[in-house]
Amino acid sequence: MRYERVKGTVDIFGQDIPYWYFVEQRAIQVALLFGYKEIRTPVFEQTELFARSVGQETDIVQKEMYTFTDKGGRSITLRPEGTAPTIRAFLENSMINLGLPQRFYYLGPMFRYERPQAGRLRQFHQFGIELIGSADPAADVETIQLAKMFLDSLELKKYKIYINSIGCQECRRAYKEALRSYYEHHYDHICDDCKRRFETNIMRLLDCKVDINVAKQAPKISDYLCDHCRDHYESIKQMLTDLRVYFHEDSSLVRGLDYYTRTVFEIKHESLGAQSTILAGGRYDGLCKELGGHDIPSLGFASGIERLILAVKAEEIEIPKPPYCDVYIASIGKQARVKAFQIAQGLRLCKIPVISDVNSRSLKAQLKHADKLGAILAIIIGENELAQSTVQVKNLLTETQSEVEFDYVVDYVLDLLKVEGRKGRGFREGNNT
């Protein structure tokens, strides 16, 4: 029987891997520059965690979660997003005792049962950050700054930042009544999904992709913000303007998760069509308390790695290619192979990527393989070389060849690679943001 990958998943290999290295390395580098520390949470959690945080009536909980009952009779869900698990870990491990604010970043797979298409998979990967313990508008600005710096580090140009404030619970109470009154007069003109949301989560009607014109004419949340939320939002806009972080206000921006309050933002890329959102987030001031902790204001964002890679490819950005083989060691005979392994180990300790033959092929076949791998140098060890305690070092770029004694081969190779501008590239590629 031949097995195939499950629908909505992909195998990542070959020419795609450098793009993943590129995006993930940049994500980590920028997060570290802002003082964030990595957090790793389980890929599955109790189902109630997501029902309580994301929202019982959201599309994620209603339609998209991978949920199962384990052998102990517990309802378990593969994580559809990373914020709730991070807050759960923060509370469970009493990280509040470490002082506030706490800054975390994560990279990992998420799972949602959606219709697979470009930029939307059932297993997808996210880079996310969470800043726990600040209600100050400066935290919102710094978070958006981090997002922008991350995208700029990928050399992306064709993106736009959209922001909105959806207020606090008090603001939204009056706003929801205004929305309900408005949509009651347009009920016959909204889609079936919106009719369901009308009863369960009326603010999500603003996010409808079918009845766009109806949503455009709906009341604006900005008219219902309390003084505190309005001041908070105005402070954010002023600081972003002062910092020359260009943004667009979008009064229909509400986000699809119930835990958001006040600031919400999305960053969209013009080349990705329907799946144009490459990064999104906002403030979730009530989530810690909702999950059994103290009332701790927090915010963050998540960015889909797959969509970022699509954006990088769409802009034809040249990315660093990770080295798989700088040096290939071709050996003939058992004793030569032992020596090849010794030399390879010496080079690897100097951070040089090396591949040695392990198939006992002919010298011609080995050199052909070295060329196919893109090696810069080939070290050749045969019976004659063993007898003289030397190797042949062939520069595959210039087709020149030199004889070098065993004791000096590592230093010779390092000097030669330095001339070619490749010394140590295996562990240093991508460190310049």
From Swiss-Prot:
GO-annotated molecular function: ATP binding; histidine-tRNA ligase activity
Pfam families noted in UniProt: HGTP_anticodon (PF03129), tRNA-synt_His (PF13393)
Source domain of life: Bacteria
Subcellular localization(s) per the UniProt record: Cytoplasm
Primary localisation category: cytoplasm
Keyword Amino-acid biosynthesis part of the UniProt annotation: no
Transmembrane domains' residue ranges: none
Gene Ontology biological process terms, A to Z: histidyl-tRNA aminoacylation
A GO CC term attached to the entry: cytoplasm
Catalysed conversion reaction: tRNA(His) + L-histidine + ATP = L-histidyl-tRNA(His) + AMP + diphosphate + H(+)
Record keyword Translocase present: no
Signal peptide positions on this chain: none
Key words, A-Z: Aminoacyl-tRNA synthetase, ATP-binding, Cytoplasm, Ligase, Nucleotide-binding, Protein biosynthesis
EC number: 6.1.1.21
Family membership: Belongs to the class-II aminoacyl-tRNA synthetase family.
Quaternary data: Homodimer.
Protein name (database record): Histidine--tRNA ligase
